[in-house]
């Protein structure tokens, strides 16, 4: 694991802190590169300015739909969708970064951060990174607390800036 990526988060437009991620580019280089490039915005599109549109308490935070903002959009740097790279990494701890999808080989730009163990997602979603440190995980927990069982958030959670470190 080498690449580090960050999100500077706002909650209802107020700065809330930074989430830093370690990407597992040694195991899933293509998936990690997609996330890194979307974080830097170097292809002319990406995560900056988008929101966490779905936050389910005791499950996960989902974001990455920078085209529609509601979970129906987004795109990868490789085109609309790309194939599942592999399922070597398991959802075996909290704070993992994994690709959201609409079924087999439908990865785009949407991702989620786990807040509990999610073994039922193994073999269905590609794990490609992790929350890097305790301060970042504390912010993930703060965002999780704004979620609900339906996924609707009680405040607007935005990725104000993002990039690589």
Swiss-Prot record:
GO terms for molecular function: cyclosporin A binding; peptidyl-prolyl cis-trans isomerase activity. SUPFAM superfamilies: Cyclophilin-like. Gene3D superfamilies: Cyclophilin-like (2.40.100.10). It catalyses: [protein]-peptidylproline (omega=180) = [protein]-peptidylproline (omega=0). Keywords: Cytoplasm, Isomerase, Rotamase. One of its GO terms (biological process) is protein folding. The keyword Cytoplasm applies. The keyword Isomerase applies. It holds the Pfam family Pro_isomerase. Its EC number is 5.2.1.8. GO terms for cellular component: cytoplasm. Binds cyclosporin A (CsA). CsA mediates some of its effects via an inhibitory action on PPIase. It is an enzyme of class 5 (isomerase). It is found in: Cytoplasm. Residues 6-164 form the PPIase cyclophilin-type domain. Belongs to the cyclophilin-type PPIase family. PANTHER family: PEPTIDYL-PROLYL CIS-TRANS ISOMERASE, PEPTIDYL-PROLYL CIS-TRANS ISOMERASE D-RELATED. PPIases accelerate the folding of proteins. It catalyzes the cis-trans isomerization of proline imidic peptide bonds in oligopeptides. This is Peptidyl-prolyl cis-trans isomerase A.
């Amino acid at each position: 694991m080498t690449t580090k990526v960050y999100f500077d988060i706002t909650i209802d437009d107020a700065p809330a802190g930074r989430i830093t991620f370690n990407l597992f580019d040694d195991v899933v280089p293509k998936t990690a590169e997609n996330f890194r490039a979307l974080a830097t915005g170097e292809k002319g599109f990406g995560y900056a300015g988008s929101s966490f549109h779905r936050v389910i308490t005791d499950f996960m935070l989902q974001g990455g739909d920078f085209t529609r903002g509601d979970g129906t959009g987004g795109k990868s740097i490789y085109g609309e969708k790309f194939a599942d790279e592999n399922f070597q990494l398991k959802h075996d701890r909290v704070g993992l970064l994994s690709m959201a999808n609409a079924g087999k080989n439908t990865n785009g730009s949407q991702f989620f951060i786990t807040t509990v163990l999610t073994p039922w997602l193994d073999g269905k979603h590609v794990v490609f990174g992790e929350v890097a440190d305790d301060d970042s995980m504390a912010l993930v927990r703060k965002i999780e607390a704004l979620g609900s069982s339906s996924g609707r958030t009680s405040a607007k959670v935005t990725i104000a800036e993002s990039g690589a470190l």
